[in-house]
Curated annotation (Swiss-Prot):
InterPro entries: Cell_div_FtsZ, Cell_div_FtsZ_CS, FtsZ/CetZ, FtsZ_C, Tub_FtsZ_C, Tubulin/FtsZ-like_C, Tubulin/FtsZ_2-layer-sand-dom, Tubulin/FtsZ_GTPase_sf. The lineage of its organism: Bacteria, Bacillati, Actinomycetota, Actinomycetes, Mycobacteriales. One of its GO terms (cellular component) is cell division site. GO terms for biological process: division septum assembly; FtsZ-dependent cytokinesis; protein polymerization. It comes from Mycobacterium leprae (strain TN). PANTHER family: CELL DIVISION PROTEIN FTSZ-RELATED, MITOCHONDRIAL DIVISION PROTEIN FSZA. SUPFAM superfamilies: Tubulin C-terminal domain-like (SSF55307), Tubulin nucleotide-binding domain-like (SSF52490). Keywords: Cell cycle, Cell division, Cytoplasm, GTP-binding, Nucleotide-binding, Septation. GTP binds at G18, G19, G20, V21, N22, G105, T106, G107, E136, R140, D184. The gene is ftsZ. This is Cell division protein FtsZ.
């Protein structure tokens, strides 16, 4: 008798352009497990610095490895010309994350091409990109919006990180490094929150089919991550996850919700029930709620709640906090976080972009894809 095979979901994270490649480097540095990393760029020199196992320099003929010159059309053509190579690299993936910095050349133009290929191959495709600061100029902003719109059409779910929100986070005494580090954690934990659900066994398992059921063709989505320690930790973490500390956005009206509670082996049934009930109350009454736990003793006393809410009406996620949350009052703390920490992806109007978080892409003055590189990813 042939023994049963153990099939694991194949998850690939693709960084394209300066910002995307640096995002991938950061995830590798932080030890994100259970995924395959790919780095794609028109800048051959920058690509040499990548820690990804798979590297692909695109546009060799058109850019001679010197970058896209902040021209999305050059980035798009470079990716199109390498379509066969990209398809071969993505083949076999069950889920593909595409990350980039919007507004420049390679990431803006190439990300939709990669997402289209991944989706055509049947992979659940999630985009994670940054929107530039307003002070980076109207041209860059317009290019970013066009790139986001194109990527939205190519992805199942799109997460957009609005850099302007960094200017509104916390008091003016918060250091630049702490602000960027906080945004960095949102990006990393967002991807990790999804992948851990699939790759890490829990007492209540969420498998890839559950994740796909919520995120496939989701369009507008809201992703929240909250963590807390001490008394009422699970409830606090859940409240943070479903209320944006920065934007007072809520998941009210979501038709599909994916929820994960991660904690040590002392995670109690009562506190799990409290957290799950809060999320259930915040969603649409008829929402499809998929719930799972991850036991991770390295968290110690900390409980981490990840919520992905999707299937909103045309007007997008609501902005009313749940249970009188002090949403807008939370400030960015130093990286040496205290007992309570929080991060959340921000929703926007459906007309502009589907799903949002707090993130960054600074550096002005360069004329190439380096402008795509989020400052918190720079070393």
């Amino acid at each position: 008798m042939t023994p049963p095979h153990n099939y694991l979901a194949v998850i690939k994270v693709v960084g394209i352009g300066g910002g995307g490649v640096n995002a991938v480097n950061r995830m590798i540095e932080q030890g994100l497990k259970g995924v395959e990393f790919m780095a794609i760029n028109t800048d051959a020199q920058a690509l040499l610095m990548s820690d990804a196992d798979v590297k692909l320099d695109v546009g060799r003929d058109s850019t001679r490895g010197l970058g896209a010159g902040a021209d999305p059309e050059v980035g798009r053509k470079a990716a199109e010309d390498a379509k066969d190579e990209i398809e071969e690299l993505l083949r076999g993936a069950d889920m593909v994350f595409v990350t980039a910095g919007e507004g420049g050349g390679t990431g803006t133009g190439g990300a939709p091409v990669i997402a289209s290929i991944a989706r055509k191959l049947g992979a659940l495709t999630v985009g994670v990109v940054t929107r530039p600061f307003s002070f980076e100029g109207k041209r860059r902003s317009n290019q970013a919006e066009n790139g986001i719109a194109a990527l939205r059409e190519s992805c199942d779910t799109l997460i957009v990180i609005p850099n302007d929100r960094l200017l509104q986070m916390g008091d003016t005494a918060v250091s630049l490094m702490d602000a960027f580090r906080s945004a960095d954690e949102v990006l990393l934990n967002g991807v990790q929150g999804i992948t851990d659900l699939i790759t890490t066994p829990g007492l209540i398992n969420v498998d890839f089919a559950d994740v796909k059921g919520i995120m496939s063709g989701a369009g507008t989505a809201l992703m929240g991550i909250g963590s807390a320690r001490g008394d009422g930790r699970s409830l606090k973490a859940a409240e943070i996850a479903i209320n944006s500390p920065l934007l007072e956005a809520s998941m009210e009206g979501a038709q599909g919700v994916l929820m994960s509670i991660a904690g040590g082996s002392d995670l109690g049934l009562f506190e799990i029930n409290e957290a799950a009930s809060l999320v259930q109350d915040a969603a649409h009454p008829d929402a499809n709620i998929i719930f799972g736990t991850v036991i991770d003793d390295s968290l110690g006393d900390e409980v981490r709640v990840t919520v992905i809410a999707a299937g909103f009406e045309a007007n997008g996620p609501g902005r009313t906090p749940v249970m009188g949350s002090t949403g807008g009052a939370h400030r960015i703390e130093s990286a040496k976080a205290g007992a309570l920490t929080s991060t959340l992806f921000e929703p926007v109007d459906a007309a502009s972009a589907p799903l949002h978080t707090n993130g960054a892409a600074l550096s002005i003055g360069g004329d190439d894809d380096d402008v795509d590189v989020p400052p918190f990813m720079r070393r």
